[in-house]
Regions:
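Short, conserved micro-motifs composed of acidic
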Residues: 1-248
């Protein structure tokens, strides 16, 4: 486990280890990336045990291009076990690359909605998918896929992650500080806002990538964002960084 120490403001590892039999089921000789738990990473294990929606989304490239997969999981005494075999989301996947699915719980009360990235139209853009009324996307026999134009650019827009009404993603569009930058957009109940660069306190002339935003609760001033960057000062290559960002 990773815990946050309120006294010294540091994240620390505990000795409470968990086994992820789930990962033994999804990992292959191919590339697996973009993991996403449907219960949005609650802080404490007893919250996990109360979760009703236990799906694990990720991407893999068994056919050469990235496709989105899902595997159900259940809670064991000390970890997570698969509750079935992984399966591809064939209604979403194409001959191009699809990945980094993130559920959008605030979009509709009776139709499950998610966002993901794809380069089906030439460059990477962020797409929205909606399932049938009253059904999960993974249960639907048909889905509606759209590309929100307000989020799109002529560059590559990738790795969307939604927490509450905020989406964070990475893009090498104009208006950044160089390479891939982190951007955010806010959902107003009907549409996404025009993306805003997260600024030079987070972004650099290097690449900032794959942001994950975690709502921190009422006791905290900021939400937690974790991302990767190949900026100088790390251990080499891409390293993980965390930062507090204002709640929106």
């Amino acid at each position: 486990h990773i815990v946050f120490d309120l006294i010294d403001g540091e994240f620390k590892m505990t000795t409470d280890l968990q086994e992820f039999g789930l990962l033994d089921s999804v990992n292959t000789e191919n590339n697996e990336l973009g993991p996403y738990f449907t219960n949005d990473f609650p802080y404490f294990h007893y919250f996990w045990k109360e979760a009703e929606d236990t799906r694990f989304f990720y991407s893999s490239d068994p056919e050469g291009d990235l496709d989105i997969f899902c595997c159900g999981y259940e809670f064991a005494d000390n970890g997570f076990d698969p509750s079935g075999d992984p399966f591809a989301l064939t209604l979403l996947n194409t001959e191009f690359n699809e990945g980094y699915l993130s559920l959008h719980s605030g979009a509709s009360e009776n139709m499950e909605t998610a966002c993901f990235m794809s380069d089906r139209d030439g460059s990477f853009d962020i797409y929205s998918v909606t399932g049938e009324e009253g059904k999960l996307i993974t249960e639907s026999s048909s889905v509606t896929v759209t590309r929100p134009t307000v989020l799109s650019s002529t560059a590559d827009d990738k790795c969307p992650y939604i927490s509450g009404n905020v989406m964070v993603f990475t893009s090498d569009r104009e208006g950044g500080f160089g390479g891939f930058d982190l951007w955010y957009s806010v959902y107003n109940g009907q549409t996404w806002s025009a993306p805003v660069n997260m600024g030079d306190l987070i972004n650099t002339e290097y690449d900032e990538y794959r942001p994950i935003l975690v709502q921190s609760g009422e006791s905290y001033v900021n939400d937690l964002m974790v991302f990767s960057s190949n900026r100088p000062g790390g251990k080499g290559g891409f390293d993980l960084y965390y930062v507090g960002v204002p709640k929106r």
